[in-house]
A protein has these predicted regions:
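Short, well-ordered beta-strand elements within core beta-sheets of diverse protein domains
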Residues: 132, 141, 211-213, 223, ...
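A contiguous, surface-exposed recognition patch within enzymatic or periplasmic domains that forms
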Residues: 187, 193-239, 243, 277-285
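Intrinsically disordered, low-complexity Ser/Thr- and acidic-rich flexible linkers and loops
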Residues: 141-147, 330, 336-341
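Histidine- and aromatic-enriched segments that form or immediately flank copper-ligand environments
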Residues: 50-179, 230-265, 285-303
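An exposed, glycine/acidic-rich loop-and-rim segment of catalytic or binding clefts
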Residues: 167-202
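C-terminal functional regions that serve as terminal interaction/effector modules
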Residues: 232, 259-326, 332-334
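Short, structured patches in soluble enzyme cores that scaffold and shape functional sites
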Residues: 135, 160, 180-182, 195-198, ...
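N-terminal, post-signal-peptide metal-ligating segments of extracellular/periplasmic oxidoreductases
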Residues: 2-130, 188-192, 196-220, 299-317, ...
């Protein structure tokens, strides 16, 4: 069967996580995307009710992570993709020796799925709890005002480990990305999650990336999340995006500002898509925090854009290693899709 025929699936991301040997995964309901040299594929309508299992685990290096399977937790946790109108039931199991939880930004949920100690929606060591997230399309309220939809680049994280508000859990890696797509949104060839967490990226050691690969012409999506105590600026060399919900311009009259640098603070999240190497070609394109002292201290990674023959002009691997680390979704890689349950 053509892989494009799968509309409900869980895709393996193929990204190694430092110190764990685990594989980052992605839960996706989107059809396979096409590259920029062909017609763009788009997100379908939502309305599905889905069920997944998620674990909180301690990693071999002492950090913490979320995973779809025991023993396969990652930092960042699995990328979760939904379409407006979907409902997701998450059976959350806490394998840690301290209480943990799951809290999401941007989606709809009842107080029992808030994931905090203040309303007793956390999970004790060894316990389980079902968190339910709902999404909705935009529409007009009965009073005539407009209600925004759920579509956007969001994120989830622990809210109780270490302190009453979860500072320790976030610091050690209990976080991940959520994408809610609107019907008709353009789909990428690959999605990568980048988390500025204090002075680290995806909790990797300073000056070690993560680095992400693409081939010239690929449509690549980045989800950028900020945690910790600091404000940063996210900058990517050689590529630009629109400062709006999707990161894409809708046409020549779209008033959205086109940028290559964005100020971000704790709990901020945004996303965008670029065509790898568009107008600039292949290369080792740097992304980093543009607070100069932060980049000097190691908040730097590479967007490795290859020619079609696989080469990268002027690039020789150096200390910025760790290619394709963190949660990601890739399409067209020949990996076997798994049905979501």
């Amino acid at each position: 069967m053509d892989r494009r025929g799968f509309n409900r699936r869980m895709l393996l991301g193929g990204a190694a996580v430092v110190g764990t040997g685990a594989v980052a995964t992605s839960l996706s309901v989107a059809p396979e995307a096409a590259s920029a040299d062909g017609p763009a594929r788009t997100a379908p309508a939502g309305g599905e009710v889905r069920h997944i299992k998620l674990y909180a685990e301690k990693l071999a290096d002492g950090q913490l992570g979320y995973g779809f399977e025991k023993g396969k937790a990652t930092i960042p946790g699995p990328l979760i993709e939904l379409n407006e109108g979907d409902t997701l039931h998450i059976e959350f199991e806490n394998t840690l020796d301290v209480a943990a939880s799951l809290h999401v930004h941007g989606l709809d949920y009842e107080i029992s799925s808030d994931g905090t100690k203040l309303n007793r929606s956390d999970v004790e060591p060894g316990g389980t709890r079902t968190y339910t997230w709902r999404t909705h399309a935009p529409g007009r309220r009965k009073d005539g005002t407009w209600r925004a939809g759920s579509a956007g680049y969001w994120h989830y994280h622990d809210h109780v480990v270490g302190t009453e508000h979860g500072t320790g859990g976030i610091r050690k890696g209990l976080y991940g990305a959520v994408i809610v797509r609107r019907k008709g949104d353009i789909l990428p060839d690959a999605t990568h999650t980048i988390v500025f967490n204090d002075l680290l990226i995806n909790n990797k050691p300073a000056h070690s990336g993560p680095d992400f690969e693409a081939t010239v012409g690929d449509r690549v999506e980045f989800v950028v999340i900020t945690h910790g105590e600091y404000y940063h600026t996210f900058h990517m060399h050689g590529h630009r995006w629109a400062d709006n919900r999707t990161g894409l311009l809708t046409g020549p009259e779209d008033p959205s500002q086109v940028i290559d640098n964005k100020i971000v603070g704790p709990a901020d999240s945004f996303g965008f898509q670029v065509i790898a190497g568009e107008g600039v070609g292949a290369g080792a394109w740097m992304y980093h925090c543009h607070v100069q002292s932060h980049s000097d201290m190691g908040m730097v990674g590479l967007f490795l854009v290859k020619k079609t023959d696989g080469t990268i002009p002027g690039y020789e691997p150096h200390e910025h290693g760790g290619q394709q680390t963190g949660a990601e979704r890739r399409t067209g890689t020949g990996q076997r899709p798994e049905h979501a349950h």
